[in-house]
Amino acid sequence: NIQSIARYSKKFSNEDLHEIIISKNLEIEAWFRKQWIKYPAPFYSSIDLRNSGYKIAPVDTNLFPAGFNNLDVSMESLYISAVQHTLEKQSAELTKILIVTENHTRNKFYSKSLTTLKSFIEKAGFEVQSCMLGDECNTEAINKDLVLNNSILSYKKFIPDIVLLNNDLSAGVPDILKNTKQLILPDLHMGWTNRSKTCLLYTSPSPRDDPL
């Protein structure tokens, strides 16, 4: 069992809490595994945590994450194993993965993240390609190298078994993805076209409505 030592930029005001979390690591992991059986986790996500010194709380979740290049390299074997396990659960026949990226791949930080993500997938034993959803010269148009033929999506003659979205679809879901037979992860309905922070704010129950 490989365990990592958490390092926080802000010191805990209660060191006992930190020690309890570390000592209960196996029980915490077991609880998460049980929850993931009941509520399957997305292929990937990132969570922003806020450390106030006496508690740590999640403040934001991203279903189309970047920042893979910031992960601890000493834990790479765990990332690769997670990729293998998650994809093999979909089908043992999977071999080819297409990552549909954001249109700002010239952003050096995003490019580093994408390179790292591709590396994890390749080391997990899969063939992987990536492409922007938008055309390089006109991002409002669909990438001309993405072709849909008989509901099968291909990119430069590369036919993926799974399409991995790393694009939040804030500009909408294009027909080329709506009509694709291949499995798309995360689901198209998870894009920002169907979600809104404003809607979440106004549809969430008031704290006063929650039972004590």
Model-derived features: positions:
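Glycine-rich, charge-decorated loop segments at or immediately adjacent to ligand/cofactor-binding or catalytic sites
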Residues: 195-201
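Redox-cofactor binding/interface segments in oxidoreductases and associated redox assembly factors
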Residues: 164-165
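Short secondary-structure boundary/capping segments
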Residues: 113-116, 179-181, 200
